[in-house]
Swiss-Prot record:
This is RNA-binding protein Hfq. It comes from Jannaschia sp. (strain CCS1). Coiled coil: none annotated. It holds the Pfam family Hfq. RNA chaperone that binds small regulatory RNA (sRNAs) and mRNAs to facilitate mRNA translational regulation in response to envelope stress, environmental stress and changes in metabolite concentrations. Also binds with high specificity to tRNAs. Gene3D superfamilies: 2.30.30.100. The gene is hfq. Residues 10-70 form the Sm domain.
Amino acid sequence: MAENKQNLQDAFLNHVRKTKVPVTIFLINGVKLQGVITWFDNFCVLLRRDGQSQLVYKHAISTVMPAQPISLYDGEE
C-alpha cells in the first residue's frame, strides 16, 4: 500500500501559501517577522511584506502563527 500523505509542516505551509494568509513568524532569538509566505522548501521559507522578500531558514524558526484560524482537516483519514 503506497502512502501518499503530506507531513503536517508541509500541509500547513502550503495552505497558508495558497490562501495568502498573513503569518507571524517568531524566531528562536525572539525576533518577530510578519508577512505572507510565498515559497518554501525543506530548509527555508520566503516571506513577503511591503514588496520586500526575506529568506528565513527553518532552523531559526520557533513558531508560525497565522493571522486567522485555518483548517487542514479534509474529512478523510
